[in-house]
Amino acid sequence: MRTISYSEARQNLSATMMKAVEDHAPILITRQNGEACVLMSLEEYNSLEETAYLLRSPANARRLMDSIDSLKSGKGTEKDIIE
C-alpha cells in the first residue's frame, strides 16, 4: 500500500485522489501526532462494503468459500454474460 504524509496529501490532493481511483488501490495517509487514514475510491469502498455484507452471514460466507474452492479445483463452469 502506498504511504504518504498528511502534508503531501494536502499539497497534492487532486493528484492523490486520481491515483487512488486509477490504480484501484488505497493510499495510507500518515500524521505525525495522530492515527493514520486511508484514502480509496468510492468504487473500492463500495466493493469492500458489499463483501463485508455478504460475509456477515456464516451460511452465505460458507457458500461463497465453497464456490471459490470449487473454482480453484477446476470444478467451475465458464458461462457468457448476457448484457
Swiss-Prot record:
Has been described as natively unfolded and proteolytically unstable in vivo, but also as structured following overexpression in vitro. Has a half-life of approximately 1 hour in vivo. GO terms for cellular component: toxin-antitoxin complex. Disruption phenotype: No visible phenotype under standard growth conditions. Delays Lon protease-dependent lethality upon overexpression of Lon, but does not fully suppress it. Induction: Represses its own promoter; more strongly repressed by the YefM(2)YoeB heterotrimer. Induced in persister cells. Ectopic expression of Salmonella or Shigella toxin VapC induces the yefM-yoeB operon and also induces Yoeb toxin activity in a Lon protease-dependent manner. Belongs to the phD/YefM antitoxin family. Changing residue 10 to A: Loss of DNA-binding and transcriptional repression. Keywords: DNA-binding, Repressor, Toxin-antitoxin system, Transcription, Transcription regulation. In solution exists as both a monomer and a dimer; the monomeric state is more predominant. It has been described as being a YefM-YeoB(2) heterotrimer and as a YefM(2)-YoeB heterotrimer. When complexed with YoeB inhibits the toxin activity. It comes from the Bacteria. GO terms for biological process: negative regulation of DNA-templated transcription; regulation of DNA-templated transcription; regulation of growth; single-species biofilm formation. This is Antitoxin YefM. It comes from Escherichia coli (strain K12). It holds the Pfam family PhdYeFM_antitox. Antitoxin component of a type II toxin-antitoxin (TA) system. Antitoxin that counteracts the effect of the YoeB toxin. YefM binds to the promoter region of the yefM-yeoB operon to repress transcription, YeoB acts as a corepressor. One of its GO terms (molecular function) is toxic substance binding.
